[in-house]
């Protein structure tokens, strides 16, 4: 199997001052191309350290993606490190210099002399275009390893990997068939509870079951060779059956996006009233393009379930909305949810049975519960379902 590695560079990455989102993205992207990373390293802005690790990994990796260090400042050392590791000098890439000058001119700016550095590449380098920025990439062969050098700006990095680097890898290597990955996302059951229920299922050859907990959800992931796709799809039905009502969506689209699409398909507008969730519902649904008619965040106040239900019923009528959803304040470990619909208003009063979680996590959990109520109503299900440490203690319905 092709050994693919990544090297992230920069003091700010090494010292944890920024999160290395490029590494996480590349690992996931390459995995789904059939190119799982075998190693990731991080090195700061030190020329000797960079040269040392380039030479070291050149003896072990078939492909190395180097990220960062292609800017115009003194601490951008990747091109010099690559040239030094190969024992050659830097040469000016005249065509890229002209491209940078054009880039700045079109934006009404004069290119700083320091940007010239971004057109200086190792003498033997293969130029790699950057269609969205001023830091071009390049590739060099060092011992057994083909090394690709890329800018650290995420938007530039992703474009270059997808449109410049991956096609080159497909040309030069015989790549394996990408694996099949089937995902189910659950809400309301613990990881250990799900594992205990699912461990009895028989997995096809080469197929693994993975669990990824990201409060308040748990993703169940079946990964295996394409030759087992039919068996995996059959197994996925068994996983859904065992996981039961805790399954809230399939794939990677996300619950807000799926709700948004369903609202649009059924021509429902939505109005929101939030207290404890502090605008999380509005944020998630607006990012997904949901047809929101009106949103409000109001200070927490103690209210009965009936008060919450009547309030959201009136709000739906006043805004001529198709649907209206409310989350009350959090008082004495209790809060209310209410959903006003053309069929009536449905409301739940719940108790949060654990307080060990931070305020932010409890808000995330309650926002997800509200979204799940909406999802279940749209699917024609009872709005109440099992939610682990959240206990439904009262429910009510207001007729139209």
Which residue stretches match the model-derived regions?
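N-terminal beta-loop-helix "entrance" segment that forms/cooperates
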Residues: 27, 31-59, 305-307
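Accessory alpha-helical/coil subdomains and C-terminal extensions
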Residues: 141-143, 149-216, 223-226, 230-232
